[in-house]
Amino acid sequence: KNVNIYMPEMNPMMIYRLDRFGRGGHHRPFNDLGFAGIRIMEAHENYTQQHQDIRIENNIKYGDTFEHVNFKYAKKLTAVNAINLASLAWAPEAPKEVFIGGIVEANVRLKWSEVKGVKGYKIYWRDTTSPTWDHSRYTEKTAFTLEGIVIDNFFFGVSAVGENGHESVVVFPNKIWRK
């Protein structure tokens, strides 16, 4: 989301695969230990230059060498990391408890613990088949009813919004709210 806002020329695209076929990535050890980790890469790799031992074969130079580093692109990747880290650093704390209700109802009810010093909150929801938060509603309250939204058809989450507009990470409901 932040990259789309601040660096739209990067045209980010999420690939929902843990890793590339037959190769590893720097993010994998983080994933293996339970941490979130993503791999940022050029989508159109040059296989004579990347992931090759340095050699010459049939008059073709193979190998990862300094002369093939695209420093303008590397600078942009560094900016992508900085944008996302800054956004997280400037964001408020996330709500600790998020309750969800709406079992056998035509509406979804959400309430959450107050986060001190925030401007408001954003309620997110998405289809169960979607990897991104496609819908949202802003509120300054700590409880909200999404009318006409059926609990079984979506995933839900809540983030805190700081005075500066930065949002915390989205928290999935972790408690049931019974009437």
Identify what each model region corresponds to:
Residues K1-A94:
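Active-site-adjacent substrate-binding region
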Residues I100, W112, F144-G148:
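Hydrophobic core positions of the immunoglobulin-like beta-sandwich fold
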Residues A106-V118:
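Conserved aromatic anchor
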Residues Y121-I123:
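Short beta-strand elements bearing conserved aromatic residues within extracellular beta-rich modules
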Residues D134-K141:
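Short beta-strand segments within Ig-like beta-sandwich modules, predominantly Fibronectin type-III
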Residues L146-S168:
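Beta-strand-rich modules
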Residues H166-W177:
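Edge beta-strands of extracellular beta-sandwich domains
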